[in-house]
Regions:
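Expand to "…catalyze enediolate/carbanion chemistry for C-C bond making/breaking, isomerization
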Residues: 1-154
């Protein structure tokens, strides 16, 4: 029985390396239900999906995640392999991140395990990114460099 939903975090907690597969761009035909079913038995600890340079395809991502669920569980007992998405927005400033926080909400709503901010130019941009990933009810770190989370809960 897995300790966590996210196998990559499990491995890191055990001081183990993690290995990924995936591309930084995808053809528009990749994010499908059938590909998700196929990838449910993948060898890698996580699957990287590049939306920084690839298409921002939420319909495809949702179908892909459904395929992963239906094709699972993984050989390690996880419901799906870990899926991490490269966020298309650049972290040039906190303002740019906040204006584009809708991308974070859309990606996380599809059931992925994590988001990678590929570039950040300041600590403030990183804080804004973390805030955009968190619900308001999660107050750990608020007042210590973080403001309230901006994701809605209803």
């Amino acid at each position: 029985m897995p300790k966590r939903i996210n196998k990559a975090i499990e491995l890191l907690e055990d001081d183990q390396p993690i290995y990924y597969t995936g591309l930084h761009t995808f053809s528009r035909d990749y994010l499908t239900y059938d590909q998700g079913k196929k990838d449910a038995s993948i060898w890698a600890d996580y699957i990287n999906i590049g939306m920084e340079h690839g298409a921002f395809d939420m319909t495809g991502l949702e179908s892909y995640m459904d395929g992963l669920v239906d094709g699972g569980p993984t050989s390690s007992g996880h419901i799906t392999p870990t899926v991490i998405i490269e966020l298309p927005v650049q972290g040039e400033s906190a303002e740019v991140i906040r204006y584009n926080a809708w991308q974070v909400r859309q990606i996380l709503a599809r059931g992925v395990h994590g988001i990678l901010l590929c570039e950040a130019s300041s600590a403030e941009a990183v804080s804004a990114f973390v805030e955009s990933c968190r619900y308001k009810i999660n107050d750990l770190g608020v007042g210590y460099g973080l403001k309230d989370g901006t994701r809605g809960v209803g």
